[in-house]
Amino acid sequence: MRVAVIGAGVIGLSTALCIHERYHPTQPLHMKIYADRFTPFTTSDVAAGLWQPYLSDPSNPQEAEWSQQTFDYLLSCLHSPNAEKMGLALISGYNLFRDEVPDPFWKNAVLGFRKLTPSEMDLFPDYGYGWFNTSLLLEGKSYLPWLTERLTERGVKLIHRKVESLEEVARGVDVIINCTGVWAGALQADASLQPGRGQIIQVEAPWIKHFILTHDPSLGIYNSPYIIPGSKTVTLGGIFQLGNWSGLNSVRDHNTIWKSCCKLEPTLKNARIVGELTGFRPVRPQVRLEREWLHFGSSSAEVIHNYGHGGYGLTIHWGCAMEAANLFGKILEEKKLSRLPPSHL
């Protein structure tokens, strides 16, 4: 069975690994991963990696399930020898609001979810309500190299090439896995897919131990300041620009992030800036995770689409990888059935 995976962010690599681990032992797979960007140059590398879905219920209930599956999988890996290399760790912190809001759908997924006490709220005078919980941190800059190593150990080939069309890789391939994120629209028109530009500042601030996410409904999602400590640096953010394709770091956005994060946590004024990155979240009303049979002139192929994970790719990736593997299994079953001789009963 010949498989072409397009895209080498967290979605492409995890989907490839999940499928290879599940089916290669019984159905030898010849798998290639095509991408014009591999780690450390993917959108996933820019992400701070905090496991937290959006606050509102997803339009597709399956997305809540996929996020939960990802949390459960990562939690099961937490005490494995691989956790440190994966960039996986527990992390606790705050979600802050101006006014009281309903509890999120994921409150029972995370550990120790509770409302903030009045004395805790005194720490954040600009906010009137909040939550505290323990979650998981999965840093893309560690996790993507770890996934890549697992795949190459299994004999999966990585091909550094920009794929211009699905037809380009269809010849001689049984299944195409489309994990191209925000660039999926270049391979197949998708009016629902848009870039959600983000910009972050990375600082050295080892005294910051808790994440702090703020939420302002009037500004929209991701447009409020957030602070997420990682293993080596702290990520500062708060930019979400729908439809903006500019890959350049913006001085204006830098100033917005710096001013708002320093107001939220004044000790950051003493932090040394060590990096600044811009990336594009693949924004869609819901994840596209489905099969499609495509014909390309004389050739044809099964396609599994897995893209449109917005700003929560690391939060939902393994659940989506398992669902893509389920779809792949159905393709295998159908191919086996089609090869069976006709019954003469």
Swiss-Prot record:
General function of this protein: Catalyzes the oxidative deamination of D-amino acids with broad substrate specificity. Required to catabolize D-amino acids synthesized endogenously, of gastrointestinal bacterial origin or obtained from the diet, and to use these as nutrients. Regulates the level of D-amino acid neurotransmitters in the brain, such as D-serine, a co-agonist of N-methyl D-aspartate (NMDA) receptors, and may modulate synaptic transmission. Catalyzes the first step of the racemization of D-DOPA to L-DOPA, for possible use in an alternative dopamine biosynthesis pathway.
Modified how: Phosphorylated in the cerebellum; probably not by PRKACA, PRKCA or PRKCE.
Keywords of the record: Cell projection, Cytoplasm, FAD, Flavoprotein, Oxidoreductase, Peroxisome, Phosphoprotein, S-nitrosylation, Secreted, Synapse
Region described as Required for protein stability: spans on this chain: 1-16
Residues reported in the UniProt entry to bind D-serine: 222, 226, 281, 311
Annotated EC: 1.4.3.3
Activation/inhibition comment: Inhibited by benzoate and thiolactomycin. Inhibited by 6-chloro-1,2-benzisoxazol-3(2H)-one (CBIO) and luvadaxistat. Meso-tartrate has no effect on activity.
Biological processes per GO annotation: D-alanine catabolic process; D-serine catabolic process; digestion; dopamine biosynthetic process; killing by host of symbiont cells; L-leucine metabolic process; neutrophil-mediated killing of gram-negative bacterium; proline catabolic process
Induction: Repressed in the small intestine during treatment of whole animal with the antibiotic vancomycin.
Traits of the deletion mutant: Knockout mice exhibit heightened anxiety and enhanced short-term memory performance. Increases the level of D-leucine, D-alanine, D-serine, D-arginine, and D-isoleucine in the brain. Increases the level of L-tryptophan in the brain; the level of other L-amino acids are unchanged. In a model of ischemic stroke, RNAi-mediated knockdown of the enzyme by intracerebroventricular injection decreases the ischaemia-induced infarct size. Does not disrupt sleep or circadian rhythm. Long-term spatial memory is unaffected.
GO molecular function term, any single one: glycine oxidase activity
Organs and tissues of expression: Expressed in the kidney, cerebellum, pons, medulla oblongata and the cervical, thoracic and lumbar regions of the spinal cord (at protein level). Expressed in goblet cells, enterocytes, mucosal contents and villous epithelium of the small intestine (at protein level). In the epididymis, expression is higher in the caput region than in the corpus and cauda regions (at protein level). In the thoracic and lumbar regions of the spinal cord, expression decreases in male mice with age (at protein level). Expressed in neutrophils of the spleen following infection by S.typhimurium (at protein level).
Positions of FAD binding: 8-11, 36-37, 42-44, 48-50, 162-163, 180, 281, 310-311, 313-315
Compartment(s) where it occurs, according to its Swiss-Prot or TrEMBL record: Peroxisome matrix; Cytoplasm, Cytosol; Presynaptic active zone; Secreted
Pfam families: DAO
Binding-site positions, D-dopa: 52, 281, 311
Class of enzymatic activity (EC top level): oxidoreductase
UniProt cross-references to InterPro entries, sorted A to Z: D-amino_acid_oxidase_CS, DAO, FAD-dep_OxRdtase
Catalytic activity: a D-alpha-amino acid + O2 + H2O = a 2-oxocarboxylate + H2O2 + NH4(+); D-alanine + O2 + H2O = pyruvate + H2O2 + NH4(+); D-cysteine + O2 + H2O = 2-oxo-3-sulfanylpropanoate + H2O2 + NH4(+); D-dopa + O2 + H2O = 3-(3,4-dihydroxyphenyl)pyruvate + H2O2 + NH4(+)
Record region (Active site lid that may open upon substrate/product migration in and out of the active site and close to increase the hydrophobicity of the active site, to make the hydride transfer reaction more efficient): 214-226
UniProt motif Microbody targeting signal: location: 343-345
Protein name: D-amino-acid oxidase
Note: Transgenic mice overexpressing the amyotrophic lateral sclerosis-associated human DAO variant 'Trp-199' exhibit lower body-weight, progressive kephosis, and a significant loss of motor neurons in the lumbar spinal cord is evident at 8 months; the effect is greater in females. The DAO 'Trp-199' transgene also potentiates the development of disease in the transgenic mouse model of ALS overexpressing the human SOD1 variant 'Ala-94'.
Organism: Mus musculus (Mouse)
